[in-house]
Amino acid sequence: MNKNVMVKGLTALTILTSLGFAENISNQPHSIAKAEKNVKEITDATKAPYNSVVAFAGGTGVVVGKNTIVTNKHIAKSNDIFKNRVAAHYSSKGKGGGNYDVKDIVEYPGKEDLAIVHVHETSTEGLNFNKNVSYTKFAEGAKAKDRISVIGYPKGAQTKYKMFESTGTINHISGTFIEFDAYAQPGNSGSPVLNSKHELIGILYAGSGKDESEKNFGVYFTPQLKEFIQNNIEK
């Protein structure tokens, strides 16, 4: 297995006024490869597992507990230039769960592209975060050939922050590294990787290659990573 994944810069961070994101063009290290293209738009994201997914300006995150979101380090950092705001389960036709200001960020101390984002409980519209989202449960484990889904906001502002779900298969797991063939694009960084029970296996962080035969990559949640996340869920 080659772990030297080429993560390419992008210019995918632009404006969506309804999310309160400022316009900006910036190279961000979250290029996503094409793979198995079983993709559908989620027009109503008010029910689980979709209402646990949040939009950052340049990526995606997933709610795991009270006021607590998991995403990539590079997404949490890049969100600084967008007034530190996230949108709960925004979709093209369904009712969103509000826009929330970020309270703080806790980065995983290891090499893994993993960060915890805490948000203020009350949205800019006066909504309660925890009453408008669901918490995604952790999977006990996963293995090669398991079916998975990836939910997020590919191409972000270019698609007006429509939510999409793609499905595929796990190819390989090694330590905290997971490879799979579910289709993804820029903006899917931080997207939850879920098993068939909608339990959280990990989060997507990168891709490699130029055609649909190439694969995508994620941070696999080992017991150690799950312990880090659980210890940082707001009480």
From Swiss-Prot:
PANTHER family: PROTEASE DO-LIKE 5, CHLOROPLASTIC, SERINE ENDOPROTEASE DEGS. Its main location: secreted. InterPro entries: Peptidase_S1_PA, Peptidase_S1_PA_chymotrypsin, Peptidase_S1B, Peptidase_S1B_tx, Trypsin_dom, V8_his_AS. Keywords: Hydrolase, Protease, Secreted, Serine protease, Signal. GO terms for molecular function: serine-type endopeptidase activity. The keyword Protease applies. Residues 1-35 form the signal peptide. It comes from the Bacteria. Belongs to the peptidase S1B family. GO terms for cellular component: extracellular region. One of its GO terms (biological process) is proteolysis. It is found in: Secreted. The lineage of its organism: Bacteria, Bacillati, Bacillota, Bacilli, Bacillales. It comes from Staphylococcus aureus (strain JH9). This is Serine protease SplA. It is an enzyme of class 3 (hydrolase). Its EC number is 3.4.21.-. The gene is splA. The active site is at H74 (charge relay system), D113 (charge relay system), S189 (charge relay system).
